[in-house]
Amino acid sequence: SFAYSGNSESVWTGENITSIWKTILINETGSYCVAARPMTMDGAEFNLDLMGYSVSEDQINNDEIGIWNYISVAEMGGVLLFLSYWIWTCLHFSKIIFPAQKVICLYIFLFALNQTLQECIEEYVFSSECIKYRQFYSVYEIIDFLRTNFYRLFVIYCALGFGITRTVPKYLMIKGISIVIALCSVYWISLYKDVYVVSEIFDMIQYEVSPAIWVYSICHLLKQCTSVTTYENASKARFFRRMLNAFIFIFCASPMLHYLSNIIFGNFDYRLSVIIGDLFTFMEKIAFPCYIMFPTHNEALAYNRNVAEEAQEKMI
């Protein structure tokens, strides 16, 4: 309860334990009491509307998850095993490691940090420690934005062959990193100052830029696959074909799996939808870059680049 005395209209904002904000307009002097009442009787069934889909109480509060727990643990275990094997192969071929693979290692670190912060956010989201929640959420948003733009930079550079079959000019890498840092700085300021219009513009641009990057990369890879000269080893052609197939699969499967996940969420079990979403996120964000840049192909690519350079020198 609270008291208000004044001549003009005022706004009182309160917060409950679930971090849901309520706004009450006040234009009269007096004492006020704010309370909440349940919309259903104890034991009654209710359906919660989430993103247009009706989810029953049993789907959300069912403690007997059973097989879903084992599937989630197995999924996470498979991710850790895959990443451990990939990092081990990087260490094994450390003498001929490519710059693109170093970028992937940095990207994996950002992805792991991002997932850790997401777990911290889920821990505080239903608690009263809203300050810690806001801090975790702000850091999570910045790291997620940084990770996403590093991923797009990696896609473009791989399609152009930088750090793989072509050397990376220093100015090009510095420009790319500078652009990413500048975008992250503006995005952070918009979040810190609560300038939501700027963050919404950034989100809108991201939805438009991401498909354009994929289409450009696929078209450039098609050109690369059809322009392999006679002096180049077949390993380069195989590498670009493998990259092209992975790019096309990710670009085509992303909207289809998103639609499938929404159908499962609304009609079957939301936990299955979460597992499918996590699995595809791992495939797109981790397995895809690790697959096209697997360190076991480094020796063949390095030999191929030397052969091509020697052939060009002989022609001159």
UniProtKB/Swiss-Prot annotation:
Membrane-crossing segments per the record: 71-91, 93-113, 171-191, 195-215, 246-266
Subcellular location(s) per record: Endoplasmic reticulum; Membrane
Endoplasmic reticulum found in the keyword field: yes
InterPro entries: 5TM-prot_SCHPO
Membrane topology qualifier: Multi-pass membrane protein
Disulfide pattern: none
Protein name per Swiss-Prot or TrEMBL: Uncharacterized membrane protein SPAC977.01
Native species: Schizosaccharomyces pombe (strain 972 / ATCC 24843) (Fission yeast)
Lineage: Eukaryota, Fungi, Dikarya, Ascomycota, Taphrinomycotina
